[in-house]
Amino acid sequence: MDYTQILIKPVISEKATDIKEAANQVAFYVLPSANKTEVKKAVESAFDVKVDSVRIVRKRPGLRRKFGRVVGKLSGYKKAYVKLSEGEKIEFFEGV
């Protein structure tokens, strides 16, 4: 599998910002078929950093939600929390 296609986009949320500052971790949405070693290699090759560990969280699809009168389904996704080595940094939105 091509490592450039594994990482879909970074997670932009309050929790992701907090763990980035506190624990030197970065969160990404990844392909549902990706595993920990593929995510580690993809981050290391894309951003030229050293990765200590990877944790993966999967949200299953199909939960029904009401959006006013409309009932819909939520799609599933997979997130990876990547812990970077000491002194390593990935800068997404610095200076924004």
Curated annotation (Swiss-Prot):
Belongs to the universal ribosomal protein uL23 family. It comes from the Bacteria. Gene3D superfamilies: 3.30.70.330. Pfam families: Ribosomal_L23 (PF00276). PANTHER family: 60S RIBOSOMAL PROTEIN L23A. GO terms for molecular function: rRNA binding; structural constituent of ribosome. PROSITE patterns: RIBOSOMAL_L23. Part of the 50S ribosomal subunit. Contacts protein L29, and trigger factor when it is bound to the ribosome. InterPro entries: Nucleotide-bd_a/b_plait_sf, Ribosomal_uL23-like, Ribosomal_uL23/eL15/eS24_sf, Ribosomal_uL23_CS. GO terms for cellular component: ribonucleoprotein complex; ribosome. One of the early assembly proteins it binds 23S rRNA. One of the proteins that surrounds the polypeptide exit tunnel on the outside of the ribosome. Forms the main docking site for trigger factor binding to the ribosome. This is Large ribosomal subunit protein uL23. One of its GO terms (biological process) is translation. Keywords: Ribonucleoprotein, Ribosomal protein, RNA-binding, rRNA-binding.
